[in-house]
Amino acid sequence: MSRINNKATQLLSAMILAGLACHSMAADSIRIGIAGAKTGPVAQYGDMQFSGARMAIEQINAKGGVDGKQLVAVEYDDACDPKQAVAVANKVVNDGVKFVVGHLCSSSTQPASDIYEDEGIVMITPAATSPELTARGYKMVFRTIGLDNAQGPAAARYIAQLKPTNVAVLHDKQQYGEGIASSVKDILGKEGIKVAMFEGINVGERDYSSILAKLKQANVDFVYFGGYHPEMGLLLRQAKEKGLTARFMGPEGVGNDSISQLSLIHISEPTRPER
Protein backbone atom coordinates (compact mmCIF):
# COMPACT_ATOMS: atom_id res chain seq x y z
CA MET A 1 0.00 0.00 0.00
CA SER A 2 1.46 3.34 -0.90
CA ARG A 3 1.21 6.78 0.64
CA ILE A 4 -0.28 9.48 -1.56
CA ASN A 5 2.68 11.77 -2.22
CA ASN A 6 3.29 14.89 -4.25
CA LYS A 7 3.31 12.91 -7.49
CA ALA A 8 -0.09 11.43 -6.63
CA THR A 9 -1.40 14.88 -5.77
CA GLN A 10 -0.23 16.17 -9.14
CA LEU A 11 -1.83 13.19 -10.90
CA LEU A 12 -5.10 13.75 -9.06
CA SER A 13 -5.10 17.39 -10.15
CA ALA A 14 -4.27 16.45 -13.74
CA MET A 15 -7.03 13.84 -13.90
CA ILE A 16 -9.58 16.30 -12.55
CA LEU A 17 -8.55 18.92 -15.09
CA ALA A 18 -8.84 16.35 -17.86
CA GLY A 19 -12.26 15.37 -16.55
CA LEU A 20 -13.41 18.96 -16.44
CA ALA A 21 -12.79 19.17 -20.15
CA CYS A 22 -15.32 16.35 -20.64
CA HIS A 23 -17.92 17.32 -18.03
CA SER A 24 -19.77 20.59 -17.71
CA MET A 25 -19.64 21.55 -14.02
CA ALA A 26 -21.36 24.69 -12.83
CA ALA A 27 -20.95 23.97 -9.11
CA ASP A 28 -18.43 25.82 -6.96
CA SER A 29 -16.91 22.54 -5.77
CA ILE A 30 -15.85 19.18 -7.17
CA ARG A 31 -16.72 16.03 -5.29
CA ILE A 32 -13.97 13.41 -5.03
CA GLY A 33 -14.98 9.90 -4.04
CA ILE A 34 -12.59 8.07 -1.72
CA ALA A 35 -13.36 4.35 -1.80
CA GLY A 36 -11.62 1.74 0.31
CA ALA A 37 -11.69 -0.34 3.46
CA LYS A 38 -12.94 1.55 6.49
CA THR A 39 -13.98 -1.74 8.04
CA GLY A 40 -12.86 -5.35 7.67
CA PRO A 41 -9.54 -7.13 8.25
CA VAL A 42 -7.38 -4.65 6.31
CA ALA A 43 -9.00 -1.45 7.57
CA GLN A 44 -5.62 -0.19 8.82
CA TYR A 45 -4.49 0.12 5.20
CA GLY A 46 -7.75 1.81 4.33
CA ASP A 47 -7.04 4.34 7.06
CA MET A 48 -3.72 5.16 5.38
CA GLN A 49 -5.46 5.54 2.03
CA PHE A 50 -8.22 7.79 3.37
CA SER A 51 -5.74 9.90 5.34
CA GLY A 52 -3.49 10.33 2.31
CA ALA A 53 -6.37 11.26 0.02
CA ARG A 54 -7.74 13.76 2.53
CA MET A 55 -4.28 15.31 2.85
CA ALA A 56 -3.95 15.58 -0.94
CA ILE A 57 -7.34 17.29 -1.15
CA GLU A 58 -6.37 19.73 1.61
CA GLN A 59 -3.12 20.57 -0.16
CA ILE A 60 -4.87 21.12 -3.49
CA ASN A 61 -7.55 23.30 -1.88
CA ALA A 62 -4.90 25.34 -0.05
CA LYS A 63 -3.42 26.21 -3.44
CA GLY A 64 -6.73 27.40 -4.83
CA GLY A 65 -8.33 24.11 -5.81
CA VAL A 66 -8.68 22.92 -9.39
CA ASP A 67 -9.79 25.39 -12.03
CA GLY A 68 -10.90 27.66 -9.20
CA LYS A 69 -13.09 24.99 -7.61
CA GLN A 70 -12.60 23.48 -4.14
CA LEU A 71 -12.50 19.70 -3.76
CA VAL A 72 -14.91 17.95 -1.38
CA ALA A 73 -14.30 14.38 -0.21
CA VAL A 74 -17.14 11.85 -0.33
CA GLU A 75 -16.09 8.67 1.47
CA TYR A 76 -17.24 5.11 0.76
CA ASP A 77 -16.48 1.86 2.60
CA ASP A 78 -16.11 -1.33 0.54
CA ALA A 79 -14.42 -3.39 3.33
CA CYS A 80 -12.19 -4.82 0.56
CA ASP A 81 -15.11 -7.04 -0.41
CA PRO A 82 -15.78 -7.40 -4.18
CA LYS A 83 -19.58 -7.45 -3.84
CA GLN A 84 -19.56 -4.44 -1.53
CA ALA A 85 -17.19 -2.67 -3.93
CA VAL A 86 -19.69 -3.11 -6.76
CA ALA A 87 -22.40 -1.64 -4.53
CA VAL A 88 -20.09 1.27 -3.71
CA ALA A 89 -19.32 1.88 -7.39
CA ASN A 90 -23.02 1.95 -8.21
CA LYS A 91 -23.59 4.42 -5.37
CA VAL A 92 -20.78 6.60 -6.75
CA VAL A 93 -22.61 6.61 -10.08
CA ASN A 94 -25.95 7.43 -8.44
CA ASP A 95 -24.33 10.19 -6.37
CA GLY A 96 -23.04 11.84 -9.54
CA VAL A 97 -19.40 11.68 -8.39
CA LYS A 98 -17.04 11.82 -11.38
CA PHE A 99 -13.65 11.19 -9.73
CA VAL A 100 -12.61 8.38 -7.38
CA VAL A 101 -9.46 7.74 -5.35
CA GLY A 102 -9.60 3.99 -4.76
CA HIS A 103 -10.23 1.23 -4.30
CA LEU A 104 -7.73 -0.51 -2.00
CA CYS A 105 -7.64 -4.28 -2.65
CA SER A 106 -7.18 -5.59 -6.18
CA SER A 107 -10.12 -7.98 -5.78
CA SER A 108 -12.48 -5.09 -5.03
CA THR A 109 -10.86 -2.55 -7.35
CA GLN A 110 -11.25 -4.62 -10.50
CA PRO A 111 -15.05 -5.11 -10.48
CA ALA A 112 -15.57 -1.51 -9.39
CA SER A 113 -13.35 -0.26 -12.21
CA ASP A 114 -15.57 -1.98 -14.78
CA ILE A 115 -18.45 0.23 -13.65
CA TYR A 116 -16.33 3.40 -13.57
CA GLU A 117 -15.05 2.75 -17.08
CA ASP A 118 -18.57 2.23 -18.43
CA GLU A 119 -19.83 5.38 -16.69
CA GLY A 120 -16.89 7.64 -17.63
CA ILE A 121 -15.71 8.08 -14.03
CA VAL A 122 -12.00 8.68 -13.46
CA MET A 123 -10.54 6.21 -10.94
CA ILE A 124 -7.03 6.35 -9.42
CA THR A 125 -6.06 3.53 -7.08
CA PRO A 126 -3.14 4.12 -4.71
CA ALA A 127 -2.95 0.48 -3.63
CA ALA A 128 -4.29 -2.16 -6.06
CA THR A 129 -1.25 -3.97 -7.50
CA SER A 130 -2.79 -6.65 -9.76
CA PRO A 131 -1.36 -6.33 -13.31
CA GLU A 132 -4.77 -7.22 -14.76
CA LEU A 133 -6.24 -3.95 -13.57
CA THR A 134 -4.42 -1.76 -16.08
CA ALA A 135 -3.92 -4.41 -18.78
CA ARG A 136 -7.45 -4.14 -20.17
CA GLY A 137 -7.02 -0.98 -22.19
CA TYR A 138 -9.33 1.08 -19.97
CA LYS A 139 -9.13 4.86 -20.43
CA MET A 140 -10.51 5.93 -17.03
CA VAL A 141 -8.47 3.68 -14.72
CA PHE A 142 -5.10 4.72 -13.26
CA ARG A 143 -2.85 3.76 -10.36
CA THR A 144 0.07 5.24 -8.39
CA ILE A 145 1.63 1.96 -7.20
CA GLY A 146 3.81 -0.76 -8.71
CA LEU A 147 2.67 -4.14 -9.99
CA ASP A 148 2.74 -7.62 -8.50
CA ASN A 149 4.59 -8.95 -11.54
CA ALA A 150 7.43 -6.56 -10.69
CA GLN A 151 7.41 -7.10 -6.93
CA GLY A 152 7.16 -10.89 -7.25
CA PRO A 153 10.37 -11.34 -9.26
CA ALA A 154 12.24 -8.95 -6.96
CA ALA A 155 11.15 -10.98 -3.92
CA ALA A 156 12.07 -14.26 -5.64
CA ARG A 157 15.55 -13.02 -6.53
CA TYR A 158 16.09 -11.94 -2.93
CA ILE A 159 15.01 -15.38 -1.70
CA ALA A 160 17.40 -17.02 -4.19
CA GLN A 161 20.29 -14.99 -2.76
CA LEU A 162 19.58 -16.51 0.66
CA LYS A 163 20.03 -20.00 -0.81
CA PRO A 164 17.23 -21.81 1.07
CA THR A 165 16.97 -25.58 0.74
CA ASN A 166 13.19 -26.02 0.61
CA VAL A 167 10.80 -23.14 -0.07
CA ALA A 168 7.05 -23.11 0.46
CA VAL A 169 4.92 -20.49 -1.28
CA LEU A 170 1.55 -19.92 0.37
CA HIS A 171 -1.27 -17.54 -0.52
CA ASP A 172 -4.72 -16.47 0.65
CA LYS A 173 -6.61 -17.54 -2.51
CA GLN A 174 -7.38 -13.88 -3.27
CA GLN A 175 -6.48 -11.96 -6.44
CA TYR A 176 -3.71 -9.96 -4.77
CA GLY A 177 -2.20 -12.73 -2.65
CA GLU A 178 -2.39 -15.58 -5.13
CA GLY A 179 -1.20 -13.36 -7.98
CA ILE A 180 1.98 -12.27 -6.28
CA ALA A 181 2.60 -15.75 -4.85
CA SER A 182 2.36 -17.24 -8.35
CA SER A 183 4.86 -14.70 -9.62
CA VAL A 184 7.29 -15.59 -6.82
CA LYS A 185 6.91 -19.32 -7.51
CA ASP A 186 7.53 -18.94 -11.24
CA ILE A 187 10.72 -16.91 -10.80
CA LEU A 188 12.04 -19.19 -8.06
CA GLY A 189 11.77 -22.08 -10.51
CA LYS A 190 13.77 -20.14 -13.08
CA GLU A 191 16.36 -19.36 -10.40
CA GLY A 192 16.76 -23.07 -9.70
CA ILE A 193 15.20 -22.89 -6.23
CA LYS A 194 13.08 -25.87 -5.23
CA VAL A 195 9.48 -24.98 -4.34
CA ALA A 196 8.39 -27.82 -2.10
CA MET A 197 4.83 -26.53 -1.66
CA PHE A 198 2.46 -24.10 -3.33
CA GLU A 199 -0.83 -23.97 -1.44
CA GLY A 200 -3.64 -21.63 -0.50
CA ILE A 201 -5.07 -21.02 2.96
CA ASN A 202 -8.50 -19.75 3.89
CA VAL A 203 -8.88 -16.11 4.91
CA GLY A 204 -10.36 -15.75 8.37
CA GLU A 205 -9.36 -19.22 9.53
CA ARG A 206 -8.01 -19.32 13.08
CA ASP A 207 -6.08 -22.61 13.08
CA TYR A 208 -3.33 -23.23 10.53
CA SER A 209 -1.88 -26.30 12.24
CA SER A 210 -2.59 -28.52 9.22
CA ILE A 211 -0.56 -26.43 6.75
CA LEU A 212 2.18 -25.86 9.33
CA ALA A 213 2.47 -29.62 9.87
CA LYS A 214 2.98 -30.00 6.11
CA LEU A 215 5.70 -27.34 6.18
CA LYS A 216 7.49 -29.11 8.99
CA GLN A 217 7.18 -32.52 7.35
CA ALA A 218 8.66 -31.13 4.11
CA ASN A 219 11.60 -29.60 6.02
CA VAL A 220 10.74 -26.17 4.66
CA ASP A 221 13.26 -23.54 5.71
CA PHE A 222 11.72 -20.52 3.95
CA VAL A 223 8.07 -19.52 3.52
CA TYR A 224 6.74 -16.83 1.19
CA PHE A 225 3.15 -15.83 1.93
CA GLY A 226 1.05 -13.80 -0.50
CA GLY A 227 -1.70 -12.07 1.44
CA TYR A 228 -2.36 -9.72 4.34
CA HIS A 229 -1.18 -9.33 7.92
CA PRO A 230 -4.05 -11.03 9.81
CA GLU A 231 -3.24 -14.41 8.28
CA MET A 232 0.52 -13.82 8.34
CA GLY A 233 0.36 -12.95 12.03
CA LEU A 234 -1.43 -16.19 12.84
CA LEU A 235 0.98 -18.21 10.70
CA LEU A 236 3.98 -16.69 12.47
CA ARG A 237 2.59 -17.16 15.95
CA GLN A 238 1.45 -20.72 15.38
CA ALA A 239 4.69 -21.63 13.57
CA LYS A 240 6.64 -20.49 16.61
CA GLU A 241 4.37 -22.52 18.90
CA LYS A 242 5.00 -25.63 16.80
CA GLY A 243 8.76 -25.14 16.67
CA LEU A 244 8.94 -24.31 12.96
CA THR A 245 12.17 -22.37 12.42
CA ALA A 246 11.65 -21.37 8.78
CA ARG A 247 12.08 -17.74 7.80
CA PHE A 248 8.97 -15.97 6.49
CA MET A 249 8.56 -13.32 3.83
CA GLY A 250 5.56 -11.46 2.47
CA PRO A 251 4.58 -8.47 0.33
CA GLU A 252 3.60 -5.02 1.58
CA GLY A 253 0.19 -6.42 2.50
CA VAL A 254 1.70 -8.10 5.56
CA GLY A 255 3.30 -4.87 6.77
CA ASN A 256 2.12 -4.21 10.30
CA ASP A 257 3.81 -2.67 13.35
CA SER A 258 3.42 -5.77 15.49
CA ILE A 259 4.42 -8.19 12.73
CA SER A 260 7.44 -6.14 11.73
CA GLN A 261 8.82 -6.52 15.25
CA LEU A 262 8.78 -10.31 15.01
CA SER A 263 11.97 -12.12 14.05
CA LEU A 264 12.49 -14.25 10.94
CA ILE A 265 10.32 -12.17 8.65
CA HIS A 266 11.15 -10.20 5.50
CA ILE A 267 8.72 -7.74 3.88
CA SER A 268 8.97 -6.59 0.26
CA GLU A 269 7.38 -3.57 -1.40
CA PRO A 270 6.01 -2.97 -4.92
CA THR A 271 8.92 -2.08 -7.17
CA ARG A 272 9.86 -1.16 -10.70
CA PRO A 273 11.40 -3.79 -12.99
CA GLU A 274 15.20 -3.69 -13.04
CA ARG A 275 16.61 -1.81 -16.00
Residue positions per predicted region:
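Gram-negative bacterial Sec-dependent N-terminal signal peptides
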Residues: 2-25
